[in-house]
């Protein structure tokens, strides 16, 4: 059986209700740690109230863990001496370690209380010694220390391993497309302080306004990258210490890696960096994750993808092929990384492919809808941008959305992406919320309910059902429907939409996949690629290819290492900002449309 999946992963992402200056109801799953334990994949993610588990990386089930601190960010799980060790983040008080010999059947129990940390990562070396890494600031390095495997208590002193270096590594620069925001004005600082002070729950110990202003200026006003999300992988005797930056709300949120000969370094920056990045396409970002091997020995990287519209921490999970080349370079294949791809049956044979398993057919398809709110027109469901969406005027069952692909295609799959559109705060939610000085938050561990009817047609008159969820009790906000073979379709329609909290129907992507029978676009051969004076950007501009829907810009430090990519739609230029100052780059601009992908000519920029 072909097992085909599509990012973001098709999970029942949990909602939370949050008040921290602003109020928001949104879904969040982030900072994933994946562990293959006793033949089963365990995936722990932030703000979910438990973990997902799977036998095959294809079908996932959820297991609640009320015994764990579910409101603590960045849960880490690793196997230590045959048991699963769990830790998560607390910045201002000592953190606990928890252990279970069988997380599906045996609750976790606390084994020790250690010290405050954020974004933890545990690693047991081949000799049985255990090391611990942590850090999540724009002012301090990633830290490492040896710990006792029995008590999890520190052995010796912590070591600063590395920090941010945005003056050398362009991808670490904060901001959308690595363009940092200008410094905040005194008025903006005062407004942030006022909002924060007003959000402190009654009775909570509060800092003075002067202390709060100082903290905000120190952490938020310097535009330095957040260096965070450590994770250690050992391969062929080398230690690969991974980290995330520059900020989870940015499309350029990525994972980089330093390499060393010992668990606590010294570490050297890998020239190919970031090794996991996805700044373009439908849903951006591929940072703060973990690296693991599947049952066949294939390497994978699972990480955080971003929406960040309703709230900065509105995030999802992505899974990407990963490997180490003959030189020991760690890299991912993230070409068309939000298109469907096949899970390998045994050893992977297509690690370096530039061709997706299926092609997108719905980009800029002609839309029609029952109604639409101002600024949320139906074309937003086909613009390949998860941050924009169609929203109906009412939450009635009579609302619908339809796409016309323009001609009949052999369709293999549909990904139906729902958005959370201006959900009002539920009444009396605060009574069950977890309260702190910074915020009030309530995780809804039980899934909500998402219902719809998906239909297809060749002529727009005679319709047949593709998926009927009108009576479902599931909650898949990024539902991926892969057909057994293909079906001929020109029109796709979603109706009878019922979303959680009685929200109005909203769709960020009605994405249709297959492959056309026509001609792929011509190759891109003429590319201008001046490099900026500070050498941190390459300003790419190319001659458009006739009939292209978009371009996949591949780049890397050698002609046989075009490991990074940036997918763009509707334009023929790109400010390539995720490069290292000291490196030269090989670049190819591949063109694509409904009929396929054509590789571009490789150029070199010194």
Question: What positions do the PLM features span?
Answer:
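Beta-rich carbohydrate-recognition and catalytic domains
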Residues: 1-222, 234-239, 244-281, 296, ...
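Short glycine/proline-centered coil/turn motifs in the loop regions
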Residues: 46, 315, 545-547, 581
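Aromatic, loop-rich ligand-recognition surfaces of beta-strand-rich domains
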Residues: 383-465, 477-547, 558, 591
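Extracellular low-complexity, O-glycosylation-prone stalks/linkers
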Residues: 455, 547-570
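Short, solvent-exposed loop/turn segments in extracellular or other extracytoplasmic domains
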Residues: 473-478, 567-575
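Extracellular fibronectin type III
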Residues: 504-505, 509, 592-606
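Beta-strand-rich modules
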Residues: 576-598
């Amino acid at each position: 059986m072909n097992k085909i999946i599509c990012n973001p992963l098709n999970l029942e992402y949990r909602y939370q209700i949050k008040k921290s200056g602003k109020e928001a109801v949104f879904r969040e799953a982030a900072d994933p740690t994946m562990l293959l334990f006793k033949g089963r994949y365990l995936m722990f993610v932030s703000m979910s109230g438990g973990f997902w588990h799977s036998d095959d990386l294809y079908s996932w089930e959820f297991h609640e863990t009320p015994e764990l601190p579910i409101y603590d960010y960045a849960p880490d799980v690793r196997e230590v001496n045959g048991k699963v060790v769990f830790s998560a983040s607390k910045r201002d008080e000592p953190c606990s370690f928890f252990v279970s010999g069988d997380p599906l059947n045996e609750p976790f129990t606390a084994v020790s209380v250690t010290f405050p940390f954020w974004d933890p990562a545990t690693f047991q070396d081949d000799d049985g010694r255990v090391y611990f890494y942590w850090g999540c600031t724009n002012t301090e390095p990633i830290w490492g220390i040896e710990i006792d495997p029995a008590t999890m208590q520190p052995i010796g002193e912590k070591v600063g391993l590395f920090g941010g270096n945005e003056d050398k590594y362009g991808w670490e620069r904060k901001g959308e497309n690595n363009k940092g925001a200008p410094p905040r004005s005194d008025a903006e600082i005062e407004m942030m302080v006022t909002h924060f002070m007003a959000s402190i729950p009654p009775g909570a110990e509060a800092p003075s306004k002067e202390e709060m202003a100082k903290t905000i200026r120190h952490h938020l006003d310097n535009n330095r990258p957040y260096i965070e999300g450590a994770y250690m992988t050992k391969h062929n005797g080398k230690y690969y210490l991974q980290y995330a930056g520059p900020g989870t709300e940015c499309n350029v949120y990525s994972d980089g890696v330093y390499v060393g000969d010992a668990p606590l370094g010294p570490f050297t920056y890998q020239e190919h960096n970031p090794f996991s990045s996805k700044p373009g396409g439908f849903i951006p970002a591929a940072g703060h994750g973990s690296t693991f091997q599947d049952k066949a020995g294939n390497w994978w990287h699972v990480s955080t993808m971003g929406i960040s519209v309703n709230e900065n921490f509105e995030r999802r999970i992505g899974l990407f092929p990963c490997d180490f080349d003959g030189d020991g370079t760690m890299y991912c294949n993230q070409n068309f990384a939000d298109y469907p791809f096949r899970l390998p049956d045994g050893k992977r044979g297509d690690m370096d492919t530039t061709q997706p398993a299926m092609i997108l057919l719905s980009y800029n398809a002609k839309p029609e809808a029952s109604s639409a709110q101002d600024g949320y027109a139906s074309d937003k469901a086909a613009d390949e941008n998860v941050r924009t969406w169609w929203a109906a005027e009412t939450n009635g069952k009579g609302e619908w959305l339809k796409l016309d692909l323009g001609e009949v295609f052999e369709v293999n799959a549909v990904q139906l992406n729902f958005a959370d559109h201006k959900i009002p705060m539920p009444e009396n939610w605060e009574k069950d919320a977890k309260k702190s000085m910074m915020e009030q938050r309530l995780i809804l561990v039980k899934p909500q309910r998402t219902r719809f009817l998906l239909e297809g047609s060749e002529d727009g008159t005679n319709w047949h059902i593709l998926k009927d969820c009108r009576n479902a009790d599931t909650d898949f906000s990024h539902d991926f429907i892969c057909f057994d073979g293909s079906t001929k379709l020109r029109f796709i329609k979603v109706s009878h939409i019922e979303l959680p909290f009685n929200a109005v129907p909203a769709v960020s992507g009605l994405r249709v996949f297959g492959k056309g029978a026509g001609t792929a676009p011509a190759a891109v051969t003429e590319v201008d690629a001046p490099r900026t004076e500070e050498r941190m950007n390459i300003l790419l501009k190319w001659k458009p290819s006739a009939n292209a829907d978009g371009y996949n810009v591949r780049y890397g430090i050698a002609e046989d290492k075009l490991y990074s990519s940036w997918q763009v739609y509707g334009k023929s230029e790109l400010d390539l900002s995720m490069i290292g100052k000291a490196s030269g780059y090989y670049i190819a601009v591949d063109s694509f449309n409904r009929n396929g992908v054509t590789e571009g000519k490789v150029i070199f920029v010194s």
